[in-house]
Each structure stands twice: as C-alpha cells, then as structure tokens.
C-alpha cells in the first residue's frame, strides 16, 4: 500500500476552496445570455468551443490532489443537476462556490460547521417551498418553446423544434437527438409503437420500391418461443386465410420449414403475411411482447400461461389498423387494445420507473412507456462543421431535458429572479444563533447567479440586484437586451425543477465540504530517474595494416 498525505482543519478546507474556485471560475463565465465561450483542447481533432457548463466542468482536472478533491465535488454538483433536471449546471456551480466560500470564512473564524450546515439545510427547505409557491404550470406550445430556446442558449429554432416534437408525441413520448447528414436541423416523428426488428425475409415486402411490407387491418400472432415446425402453426394460418385479413407474426425466431412455408404462401398470394423477431432480450422481451399484446388487444401465446401455438384461436390474436415493416423496424399503428387496459399497463410501468435504482432500466422503461402512450420523435441536428455539430447537439440535449423538467414541475422567472423573490421566505426562519449563520449564507448566496449574469454582460451587479430586489413578482433584468422587463412575459423563464435541484445539490455538497475536518490523498511517487547507462566499451586496439 502506498504512503498517504493527510491534511487537517483549515489547511484541508483551504485546499478544497482553491479547487472549488478553480472549477467554478472556469464554469461561471458561461452563465447567462452574454456568457462567454470556453475553448477546450482535445487530444485529437480541433478544440471544442462550448458554453455548456457541464462540458467545461468535466474537463477540469487539477494537479494538486487536495485541490482536485474540491473541484471534483463541485463537478458532482454540476453532473447531478444535469442528470436530474437537464440544465442549471452553471447555476448549481455558482451557488456551491458562493455557499462554500462564505461558510469557510465563518468556520475559520471559529463557528461550529455542524450548526451552520443545519441552518443551511433549513434555509434551503424554506426556499424550495417558496419556489414551488411561485411556480406556474406550463401548458401551451409557446411557453414550451420559450423554455427550450433559453436552455439552448437563446437558439429559437431549437426551442421551436422541441415544442413541436412534444406536441406530436406528448410529454411521455420518446424524443431522441441524432446527428443529421444535412446542414439543417429537422424533426421526424413516428406514430404508433415502433421496435427495432425488421422482416425475416425480403420476400415479405409488398412495396418493392420502398422495400416495405404494409399490412392493413392486420391480425397479429404474438408467440414467445421459436417456430420451426410448420404443423404447429397450420391451424392459425388456416383460420387467418379464411378471414381474408393479413397476418403479422412476432416470435422469438422463425426458421426452417415454417419460414419457407410462410414465404411460399406469400408469393402465391394465398396469405398476406409478414414475420419479425420479437424485440428485446430475456425478461425485457417478455415485457415488450406483453406491451404489444395489450396495445393490440391480443394475448401472448406462451406455454407458461397455458397456451399452445396449435390451439391458438382468432380471438387470441391482436389487431391493428396498419403495420409497416422495413428491413430494420416494425411500426404498429392504431392497435385495437382497450383504453382501460393500456392505461393500467401505463400505471404499472410508471410505478416501476419510480421504484428502479438503475439508470439503464429507467431509460428502457421510459422507452416502453412512450411507445404505449405517445410515439417517438427524432430531432436530427445539422451543422456546417463537426465541431459545431457536437456543440449544437449538446445544446439540444440540454434544452430537451430542461423542457421536460418544465412540463413536470412548472416554471419560475428566469435570470436568477426566482431566487431573489424567494428570499422573503427566509424572514420567517428564526433559528439558534449558530444555525442562523447558515440562513445568512443562503440569503447572500442566492444573489450569486444574478450577479454573475450581470458580470458576464459587463454591467455593475450591485445596481442590478438592487433594482430587481425593489421590483415585484416577475420583474427582472434581461441581460440580452440590457433592459428591465417582466421575465415571464419576455419568455425568460427557468423550469422550477432546475432551480430547485441546482440549489439542493449545491447546498448539499457545500455543506459536506464545510464539515470536512480531514483529507487523505495518495503521496505522489518520486521519480527515481533513469538508470545509468552501462559504461562504454573499452577502446579497440589498432587494426594493423588496414587502409582507411
């Protein structure tokens, strides 16, 4: 085990402060509409130019291990806020720096850090409750577009595309962001349920020009095992052929004579049929098959449930108005499932989303939910260069997260104004003397975001804070135009969730750093230098009689 270095008390906290300042000073220059750019060197390719706080934070790594711990803790604030709310990373970093800076001065002056932390926690509770009171629910297309625009660093086209996507697939729908081949940013939407499995044989294609199989008013056989034996499938094929409706088969796999028979029947025009593999793997596959069954009003033919393929009747098959299958995807449009069953399934998936601790599982559950409820929209981000494309894609993803957050918990006036308006809640928070210092810290720290926005715009921050404090409700400072306006009317808004998470995460980590009394890091290894080269070879005797 290698030797460790230990820092105690003031020495440790000062090292943390230097690290916090190094990271926060790099990140906070990006805050607000007049935020500056940060250029990040990349080991290959051109440098990255960004105004995204979390991208800047991720790049900061300090040489001194103790200072680096401080920087990494604040980085945690930024990434946690980004994960939960999708935006507010820079605000969270600015708040964490302000809280820790003031708190460390008080601790250095001999005040009890544990009591200060308790005061901070109680003050934050009061502010969060006040933010929720100020919060205004978001409803229409225009407000959604405004949130998207602000989170995308005032890019109106991105805001409009996000609002359009949410309108088309609903707030539960899946919206994904991809890089486009063209220079324009565009939106593509998929109605109904789509999964990533294409036809098992190109002979199922009904539209050779587009290489698609389209089934109108189709019946759907959903089976959870492989089908290789034709005779098991014969009864259901005969019943479907009599009904004259197309048949879609979704199974773990279809091979051998079963697949050959389906292809022959399709080519001869006896039966309009198409077969695809079931989506997903393992338990997730079972769940997705059940989703498809509920959406189409059918049953999963599973031996576990006591159903056998050869005993399948027409009543067990699902139905859909239209199914489109290409070589990669299957889309089921307008399934015949009952609304009550679909809503029951949606409730069940929502409960699973709340219970799960795995981010991966949560993402997959949300995808399943979206496929049942709304649909899928794809925003294709276009740009002139690869550098611009990466930067723009990051902004679109941020804006999308923030817009979802706004739909979840509503909006508050942006530009740091919500924090100023929530300050009144602290007047009623009266605590013992040492804890009251925590309230004082939060009181002044909540001014930090609006001060930084003004600083980045090149305006005197004290004048801005004073004017905003004397105003009422949504009155605030618009740094983009250097004017004082009603922030809600001007469309300068923040999702309540973003403001709440930024403050909660910042105060949580700042409180932990304030109550740190000891730091341990690995001692840097001393380079022993390169080993000495072996001595030179002895001189060679004269080589008599040779001409040179």
From Swiss-Prot:
It is an enzyme of class 5 (isomerase). It catalyses: ATP + H2O + a folded polypeptide = ADP + phosphate + an unfolded polypeptide. GO terms for biological process: protein refolding. ATP binds at residues 30-33, 51, 87-91, 415, 478-480, 494. Keywords: ATP-binding, Chaperone, Cytoplasm, Isomerase, Nucleotide-binding. SUPFAM superfamilies: GroEL apical domain-like (SSF52029), GroEL equatorial domain-like (SSF48592), GroEL-intermediate domain like (SSF54849). PROSITE patterns: CHAPERONINS_CPN60. One of its GO terms (molecular function) is unfolded protein binding. Belongs to the chaperonin (HSP60) family. This is Chaperonin GroEL. It comes from Trichlorobacter lovleyi (strain ATCC BAA-1151 / DSM 17278 / SZ) (Geobacter lovleyi).
């Amino acid at each position: 085990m290698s030797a460790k270095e230990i820092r105690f008390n003031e020495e440790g906290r000062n090292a943390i402060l230097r690290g916090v300042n190094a990271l926060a000073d790099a990140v906070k220059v990006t805050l607000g509409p007049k935020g500056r750019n940060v250029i990040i060197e990349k080991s290959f390719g051109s440098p990255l130019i960004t105004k995204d706080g979390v991208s800047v934070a991720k790049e900061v790594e300090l040489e001194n291990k103790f200072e680096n711990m401080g920087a990494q803790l604040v980085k945690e604030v930024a990434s946690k806020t980004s994960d939960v709310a999708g935006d507010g990373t820079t605000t969270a970093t600015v708040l964490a720096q302000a809280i820790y800076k003031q708190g460390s001065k008080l601790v250095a002056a001999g005040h009890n850090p544990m009591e200060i932390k308790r005061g901070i926690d109680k003050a934050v509770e009061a502010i969060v409750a006040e933010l929720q009171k100020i919060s205004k629910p978001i409803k229409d297309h225009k407000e959604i577009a405004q949130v998207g625009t602000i989170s995308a660093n005032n890019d109106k086209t991105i805001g409009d595309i996000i609002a359009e996507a949410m309108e088309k697939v609903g707030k539960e729908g899946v919206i994904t962001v991809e890089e486009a081949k063209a220079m324009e940013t565009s939106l593509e939407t998929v109605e109904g349920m789509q999964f990533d499995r294409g036809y098992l044989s190109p002979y199922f294609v009904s539209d050779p020009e587009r290489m698609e199989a389209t089934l109108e008013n189709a019946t759907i056989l959903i089976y959870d095992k492989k089908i290789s034996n034709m005779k098991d499938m014969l009864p259901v094929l005969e019943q479907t052929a009599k009904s004259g409706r197309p048949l879609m088969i979704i199974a773990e796999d279809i091979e051998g004579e079963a697949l050959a028979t389906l292809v022959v029947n399709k080519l001869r025009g006896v039966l309009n049929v198409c077969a695809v593999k079931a989506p997903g793997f393992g338990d997730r596959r079972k769940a997705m098959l059940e989703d498809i069954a509920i959406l189409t009003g059918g049953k999963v033919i599973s031996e576990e449930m006591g159903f056998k393929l050869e005993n399948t009747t027409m009543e067990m098959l699902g139905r859909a108005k239209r199914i489109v299958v290409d070589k990669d995807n299957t889309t089921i449009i307008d399934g015949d499932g009952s609304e009550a069953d679909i809503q029951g399934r949606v409730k069940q998936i929502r409960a699973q989303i709340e219970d799960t601790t795995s981010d991966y599982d949560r993402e997959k559950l949300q995808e399943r939910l979206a496929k049942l409820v709304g649909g899928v929209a794809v925003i294709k981000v276009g740009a002139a260069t690869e550098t611009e494309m990466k930067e723009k894609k990051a902004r679109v993803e941020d804006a999308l997260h923030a817009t979802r957050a706004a739909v979840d918990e509503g909006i508050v006036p942006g530009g740091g104004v919500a924090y100023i308006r929530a300050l009144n809640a602290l007047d009623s928070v009266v605590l013992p003397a040492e804890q009251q210092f925590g309230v004082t810290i939060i009181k002044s720290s909540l001014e930090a975001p609006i001060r930084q926005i003004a600083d980045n715009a090149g305006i005197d921050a004290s004048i801005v804070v004073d004017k905003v404090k004397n105003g009422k409700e949504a009155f605030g400072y618009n740094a983009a135009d250097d004017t004082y306006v009603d922030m809600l009317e001007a469309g300068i808004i923040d999702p309540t969730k973003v403001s709440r998470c930024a403050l909660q995460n910042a105060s949580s980590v700042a409180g932990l750093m304030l109550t740190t009394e000891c730091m341990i890091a690995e001692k840097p290894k001393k380079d022993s230098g390169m080993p000495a080269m072996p001595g030179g070879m002895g001189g060679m005797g004269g080589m008599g009689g040779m001409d040179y």
